[in-house]
Amino acid sequence: MNKFDIAVIGGGMVGAAVALGFAKQGRQVVLIEGHQPDVYTDEQAMDIRVSAISHHSVDILQHLGAWQTIEQMRVCPYRRLETWEHPECRTRFNSDELGLEQLGYIVENRVIQLGLWHQFDQYPNLTVICPDSLASLEFGDDVQITLTSGSTLCAEWVVGADGANSKVRDFASIGVTAWDYRQHCMLINVATEDEQQDITWQQFNPSGPRSFLPLCGQQASLVWYDSPKRIKQLGAMSNEHLAEEVMAYFPAELGHIKVLQYGSFPLTRRHAQQYVNNRCILVGDSAHTINPLAGQGVNLGFKDVAALLKVLEGQSISADLLKTYERNRRGDNLLMQSGMDFFYKTFSNDIAPLKLLRNAALKLADKTGPIKQQVLKYALGLK
């Protein structure tokens, strides 16, 4: 039976990053993933799943050797961010305020994943098993891993990077705290009449926010949060009818659009009660999911990866060191989850006094330079 130092279950963005990081440290690593990412071509349609990548995440991707490959495919830098409910009460962020060329990048998830996968061949100590998936884990001095193909292998530690419905988390007997936001989120890729933009914006509404994320060329990703019933209704429309509905309910800043593709998913919050148990380590969505309000999901996952790699650099893996990783990350992730929930609950109602207060707060926030800069630095991973 093949034996490894670490088995990573899940080869998405976070799983690929942690596998690369451990391979870079010289450990014997196996990565198990069900689907190999498609080869990139410029003619491919944009992935409907995109992420707002922070400076901290770019640093991690550069350290892993993947960022240059990602940039050579397609990324869209953004330099400005605006958020508002009433048009006259806006909070604006600009990269110039921090002396940066851009606040971050909007990048398709599959492009990030593919950029990481392109680095695998550099590490003979990294084995990729794909397509295959986890069937069971048995715990002893090591972990025996059985795959759905019937293959078995052994690892000292298992990293769960297999998403919100993590099998690793279940096999490791790690509980979760979870609730449903009773909202769904629709992602809509559109063609715009404007040239490539450098701004991302979000308008709050009692029924849920509406967001704009620029993509390369004359394209953009729109995010529409609403009740499950409303999102189901939108999902049944033709592209032409949906475009009319979007232009009617989104801010005038959007302009004329053509719908290219769309999809939707329910909003839920999950947080693992432990990040480490039974020789299993959780990272990314396996450990925590967050309201996508600020696009911080994958950035939190990359922060997990950086913290895990840092605490284990040059060390034999031990439960004590892994508890340090858990302490370092669980509180930060909980803080971000709670912050997003606060914004969600504050803006998802139509109570008149609260509406007045929150709009005044947004207008005031735009004037408080030092505080605004600190909030922005935290979101960008600069502190």
Locate each region found by the language model:
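Conserved N-terminal helical subregion
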Residues: 2, 59-63, 73-171, 179-184
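N-terminal Rossmann-like FAD-binding beta1-loop-alpha1 element of flavoenzymes
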Residues: 5-31
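Conserved Rossmann-like nucleotide-cofactor binding loop
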Residues: 14, 37, 165
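Glycine-rich FAD pyrophosphate-binding loop
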Residues: 23-46
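N-terminal glycine-rich dinucleotide-binding loop that anchors FAD/FMN and/or NAD(P) in oxidoreductases
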Residues: 46-71
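Conserved FAD-binding catalytic core of PHBH/FMO-like flavoproteins
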Residues: 61, 158-262
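FAD/FMN-dependent oxidoreductases across multiple families
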Residues: 230-319
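C-terminal helical "tail/cap" subdomain of flavin- and related membrane-associated enzymes
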Residues: 310-383
